[in-house]
Amino acid sequence: MKPNRILPLVLVLACSIAVARGTYQEPEDFLADTFGTEPPSPGVVWLRGETRETSKAILGHKYPSLRIRYWGNAERSAWILEEIGKEQPITVGLVVSNGRIERIKVLAFRESRGWEVRHPFFTDQFRDIGLTGERGLDRDIDGISGATLSVRALKKLARLALYLHTRIPATDDTP
């Protein structure tokens, strides 16, 4: 193949990889979509003791901070969490309502592969999913060929958000 024919092909490939990476929604916009124009004040779940150990078991490693912010209350909460796909973090917004996933959305994706997890055909599988007694998801999630690590990251974050939702104090009266 002549070099002048290869260049357009390389440019198209490079552009498609660049389009896969990016910020799809800002966290503030995700919270506004979830709660309306004025999201509730954030609360904090501290990762200490059993909470820290369970979070570590769910993720397979320690969460990078000692506390995780949430918005909402013990009935309905929103979480913005990150997990590494293959090499880069994936930022995900999750809404938990009465112990079930209400909504999951990829807010930012930084990997060159696996970006398909951001599409509704994949994320809709998480709707109304909960935790089993062993803190696994109570329903199977179909994978995406070539996106195994991204799929795994979203499944871990769904499990983590569902678990952390149970750690919100029942007396928290944040709207």
PLM regions: where:
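Bacterial N-terminal signal peptides
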Residues: 8-16
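Flexible, solvent-exposed loop/hinge segments and secondary-structure transition points
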Residues: 19-148, 152, 156-175
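Bacterial N-terminal signal peptides that target proteins for export
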Residues: 1-7
